[in-house]
């Protein structure tokens, strides 16, 4: 990410695939703009609703919480009970961390140098058509244990979607 900072100085993000959740459990990565957020409270509530959690793994404005249920149920619970939070990723192994600001600072704030993973996907961003926010930063979660990044503008997405629908 540091080497890519010149190409995209507005924000940075990374998806790590590491430390898979135990069978029957899932892993959520959550974001709060409040860095003093009470992650222990959320982890305790999730544990009470679904069973066991070893507590949150906190990295700057994000927390990873493992719960004993499927990711869809846990994600819905978070959205219903803590609408102030954003679900960055869900699945067995994925953890997505992203933030607006300089990629060099992002690497340090999130302690990324100390992480190891089976694989990772990183992105830096220079916003051209949307505002600079954590939510607009890449990678984007696209499903359980899936994410994507893209370069460029997707200004013709509605036309392409209609073409694809017509083609079946």
Regions found by a protein language model. Name each.
Residues 1-168:
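N-terminal segments that mediate ammonia production and transfer
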């Amino acid at each position: 990410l540091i080497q890519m900072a010149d190409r995209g100085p507005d924000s940075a993000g990374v998806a790590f695939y590491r430390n898979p959740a135990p069978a029957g459990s899932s892993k959520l990565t959550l974001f709060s703009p409040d860095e003093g957020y009470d992650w222990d409270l959320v982890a305790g509530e999730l544990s009470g609703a679904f069973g066991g959690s070893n507590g949150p793994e906190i990295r700057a404005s994000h927390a990873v919480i493992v719960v004993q249920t499927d990711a869809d149920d846990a994600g819905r619970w978070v959205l219903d009970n803590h609408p102030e939070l954003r679900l960055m990723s869900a699945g067995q192994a994925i953890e997505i961390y992203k933030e607006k600001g300089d990629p060099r600072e992002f690497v340090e704030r999130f302690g990324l140098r100390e992480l190891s993973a089976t694989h990772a996907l990183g992105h830096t961003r220079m916003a051209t058509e949307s505002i600079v926010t954590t939510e607009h930063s890449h990678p984007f979660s696209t499903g359980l244990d899936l994410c994507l990044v893209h370069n460029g503008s997707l200004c013709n997405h509605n036309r392409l979607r209609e073409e694809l629908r017509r083609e079946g």
